[in-house]
Amino acid sequence: MAGSGVRQATSTASTFVKPIFSRDMNEAKRRVRELYRAWYREVPNTVHQFQLDITVKMGRDKVREMFMKNAHVTDPRVVDLLVIKGKIELEETIKVWKQRTHVMRFFHETEAPRPKDFLSKFYVGHDP
């Protein structure tokens, strides 16, 4: 008896999950744009403060690349989670809680996707 009530309550709760911050996708997109603008404005300060061996343009291009990596996400809760993580990274960078090496990890060469078929794995040297 009690088991069916619990099952019904969990099934009802799982269908109506409240988003973290954004009520809909438009609000989530607005939060992403705000975060992008904050990172875009912070790049010149970061390059100067950490004395990075990159230009401001390269830094801004990397910021764009990092944001475009998650452009396919459509769930507002996941977008909110990514925005929260981005804000934490931004705060750590602004307050110099990171060291130069932590910041430069973002600027390693973009990794090529791993091969998926047998011949590509064989040519690269990965195990099948």
Swiss-Prot record:
Modified residues (Phosphoserine): 11
Domain of life: Eukaryota
Keyword Membrane: yes
Record localization: Mitochondrion inner membrane
Membrane topology, record value: Peripheral membrane protein
Keyword Mitochondrion: yes
Keywords: Disease variant, Electron transport, Membrane, Mitochondrion, Mitochondrion inner membrane, Phosphoprotein, Primary mitochondrial disease, Respiratory chain, Transport
InterPro entries: Complex1_LYR_NDUFA6_LYRM6, NADH_Ub_cplx-1_asu_su-6
PANTHER family xref list: NADH DEHYDROGENASE [UBIQUINONE] 1 ALPHA SUBCOMPLEX SUBUNIT 6, NADH-UBIQUINONE OXIDOREDUCTASE B14 SUBUNIT
Primary role: Accessory subunit of the mitochondrial membrane respiratory chain NADH dehydrogenase (Complex I), that is believed to be not involved in catalysis. Required for proper complex I assembly. Complex I functions in the transfer of electrons from NADH to the respiratory chain. The immediate electron acceptor for the enzyme is believed to be ubiquinone.
Record protein name field: NADH dehydrogenase [ubiquinone] 1 alpha subcomplex subunit 6
Species whose genome carries this gene: Homo sapiens (Human)
Encoding gene, per UniProt annotation: NDUFA6
